[in-house]
Amino acid sequence: MLNGLPPLVSPQTRLLILGSFPGAASLAAQQYYGHPRNHFWPILQAIWPSSPEDICASSYQIRSEWLLSKGLGLWDVYAACEREGSLDSRIRSPVLNDLAGLKVLCPKLAAIAHNGGESFKHARHTEQLGLPVYRLPSTSPANASWSFERKLAAWREVFEKYGLI
C-alpha cells in the first residue's frame, strides 16, 4: 500500500486543487507534481508570468510557499492505494482522504478544482463540502490529447473566476 502526501494548504487557501494520487516520481521526491514533464508548475508559471522568480526552476519549498501565497492549495482524493507505476488506471484498493476537515484548515476555501478525470470521479464526495466543484484537464504528461495552451486556458478560467489572477 502506497501512502500519499499531506495537504499543502493554509488558512488563506481559497481554491483547493485535488489530484488523484501522486505519481511515482512525486512520491519519490515527496513533492506534488514532481514529474518533470507534468504541466502543473509550467501552467502556474504561465498564469502568473510576472512572478519575481522562475517557479519551475525554484526549489519545492519556494514553489510551495509561492502557491500558498496565491490562495491555492493542493491535495489528492486518495490517501493511499496500491499501484504499479504512475497511471491512474492502475490504481487499486484506494482509500479516500477525509476532506471534511478542510473547512477548519481553510476557512476561506471557496471552491474545489479536480485535476483530471480520476479525481473528478469523486466530485460527489467534494460537493458535500457545499462548495462549487470544477473539473480541470489533467496536467499529467499522459493527457496528451490536450495541448498545453488548451489546458492553460481551462485552468486560467477557473482562477480568474475566484479572483486569483
Give short role names for the model-derived ranges.
Residues 14-15, 111:
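Structural motif
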Residues 22-25, 39, 79-82, 118-121, ...:
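Short, solvent-exposed loop/turn segments at secondary-structure junctions
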Residues 42-46, 101, 105, 157:
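Residue-level signal for well-ordered alpha-helical scaffold segments within enzymatic catalytic domains
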Residues 69-118:
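Internal catalytic-core helix/loop-beta-alpha segment
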